[in-house]
Amino acid sequence: MSNTETASAFSHEIHDPSDAEWINDEAGLARVIERVLLEPAYAIDTEFLRERTYFPRLALVQIAWPTGLVLIDPIAVDLAPFRRVLESDVIAVFHAADQDLEVLEYACGTVPRRLFDTQLAAGFVGFSTPSLSTLAERIMRVKLSKGDRLTDWTQRPLTTAQKSYAASDVIYLLAMRAEIEAQLESAGRSAWVEEESELLRTRARGQSYADKAWWRLKDGRVLRGRDRIVAQELCAWRERRAQQDDKPVRFVLPDLAVLSVAQAKPTTFAELAATRGVDGRYLKSGAGNEIIQAIERAADLPAAALQLPEPEDFDKRLRPALTLVSAWVSQLARDAKIDASLLATRSDLISFLRGDADARLARGWRGTLMGDAVRQLVSGEAALAFARDGSLNLEHRSNQPLRVEVAVPTADWVLDAPDPNAA
C-alpha cells in the first residue's frame, strides 16, 4: 500500500520519506523551530551512536508535522536552540522515547515538557512493547523497511536510502497517535497514559546514580557479604571514571574484572595486576591506584551502605501471596488488554505487599484500578478460583465474583491483535 493510499484512510497526511528536507545550518534550524511552534504536536526521532563513548553522540534528528518533514544534521548545526520547542506546549510524539529523551537532554539540556509515546500508549490498548514496524502494520496497514541497523549515522554524506529510512521513523507517528488516542478515550484510559508519560518524562536517565551502578553488573548476584560492598564501590568508581573520560564502562574496567577484584580484594598494585580479568589497559592514568582506594573505602563501609536492587528483607511468609497476586495481575491484564508490565512489575508487587508508603499500586491509576482488590486478596477477604476456561476469577469468600470494572478498547486493530501477555 502506498503512502497516499494509506493517508486516505486517516486524518493525518502521510509524507513520502524521500521528500524530507535536509537541515544543516542555523537559518534552516531557526525556520523549523518557528514552524513547529505553530503546531499542536510534532513527531520526532533521533539517531545516535555510543559504542565507544559514555555519552550518546547525536547524529540525526527526524521531525515531522502535518505539512513538513525534515532531517536535522546536529553534526553541522548546534541543536541547542531546539530547546525552545522542547520547553513549549507543543506535544512531542515519539515511539519508544526513553533513549531519545536521554539524547535530547544531553544535546539540549532538557526533555520535552509534553510528550506522547506510541509504544507506551499502545500498551494500554492491547500491545506489549510493540516495535514501530508492528504498530505501523497493525494500525496503518503498511510494512516498514527494516533498513540497515548497522548504519553509522555519523558518516557524511548519508545516502538517499539512509535518509528515507530515517524519515520513515516519523511519518506515521502523528496518525498512529490519533488512532491510539481515540481508543484510549473510548476506554477511559487517557489519564492513565498521561500519568505514565509524566513518569517517563521525569525519570532519571543518562548519568546513572553511581551507588546503584552495580545493579547492572553481570552475575553480580553471585556475590555475598563484603564482596558485594566492594563491587558496589568499584562500580560507583567505574561509573564516575567512565563519565569523566567519556568512555563505556566496559572500557574502564570489564564486569569480569570487577567480580574478580571484589572477591580477591587485592591490597597492592602487583596483586591487582595479577587478578583475573585485569590487565595493563585498565590500570593506566592512575586508574590502578583509584581501584585500590575504592577497595579500601569499601572495607570501612557498614553493611547497611549496600544499595540493593530489590528488598531482600521481604517477608518470606508473603512469598505465596506474591505468587498469587502475580497470577491475578496477569489475568487482569489479559482481560483488560493491558500490557502486564504496565500494571505491575515484580518490584511493584513486593513494594505493595511490604506496605511501602510510595508503592505504585497504592496510588494513581493503578491504585484506583486494582489496589483494593489486591488488599482483599492478601488479607484473605477474597480468593482466586479457576474457571472452566482456565482463567482466574477473583471472588469474595462468600463465593460471589469480585469484579474489577474496566472498559476495553474496541478498534479492530486492537481486538485482532495477539494477546500481549501470552506466554
Residue ranges and their predicted role:
Residues 1-42, 46:
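N-terminal accessory regions of nucleic-acid-interacting proteins
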Residues 40, 59-61, 249:
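Structural beta-strand/beta-sheet cores of well-ordered domains, especially the beta-sheet scaffolds
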Residues 9-16, 22, 60-62, 67-174, ...:
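Active-site-proximal helix-loop-helix substrate-binding element of RNase H-like nuclease domains
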